[in-house]
């Protein structure tokens, strides 16, 4: 029922979570991708979206948001200085720029973590990199501001209409009231 009744964003989150925890061996992925059953085309698309590297579900959503808005990103990008020394690893690198976008959860409000974050931000700035931090609220309700930041970093005109693709994906997922209602209706219909 999960594969048949869920949309790509939800399935992508499940795939990424299972991979991150080592619960989805390669042979099982191959089996899932090769068999035909209700929902298998959707599952195959979800595997295409699940590029790996996410350390949280919100990172997955942030990555899918960028890709839906036609922003090329690379997950878990390692940034080095001019000597090749490690500076930081960013959740999402906006390909072709010196900017990373990251999900900032509640852990970043801890005073000790906040000090580490500020030190890291200084290292990034010293090497000419910029960082944009976003919350779950931003991802769900302020996507156009994330897109605006990306457009600015890419040096392209801001087109807020590009966010519509993200809104369409989000609307069908369990991260929206509409997506939750779709699942409730599907469950009721199957009883």
Where are these regions (language model features)?
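Short, small-residue-biased leader/transition segments that mark boundaries at the very start
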Residues: 1-3
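Short alpha-helical scaffolding segments that buttress acidic/His motifs in well-ordered protein cores
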Residues: 14-15
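Surface segments flanking catalytic/ligand-binding clefts of nucleic-acid enzymes
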Residues: 19-191
């Amino acid at each position: 029922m999960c594969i048949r009744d869920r949309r790509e964003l939800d399935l992508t989150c499940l795939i990424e979570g299972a991979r991150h925890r080592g619960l989805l061996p390669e042979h099982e992925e191959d089996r899932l991708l090769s068999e035909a059953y209700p929902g298998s085309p959707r599952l195959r698309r979800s595997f295409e979206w699940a590029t790996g590297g996410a350390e949280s579900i919100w990172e997955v959503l942030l990555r899918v948001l960028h890709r839906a808005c036609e922003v090329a990103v690379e997950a878990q990008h390692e940034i080095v200085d001019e000597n090749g020394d490690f500076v930081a690893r960013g959740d999402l690198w906006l390909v072709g720029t010196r900017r990373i976008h990251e999900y900032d959860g509640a852990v970043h409000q801890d005073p000790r973590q906040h000090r580490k974050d500020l030190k890291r931000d200084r290292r990034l700035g010293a090497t000419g990199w910029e960082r944009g931090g976003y919350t779950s609220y931003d991802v769900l309700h302020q996507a156009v501001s994330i897109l605006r930041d990306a457009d600015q970093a890419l040096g392209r005109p801001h087109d807020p209409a590009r966010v519509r693709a993200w809104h369409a994906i989000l609307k069908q997922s369990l991260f929206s009231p509409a997506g939750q209602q779709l699942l409730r209706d599907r469950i009721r219909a199957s009883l």
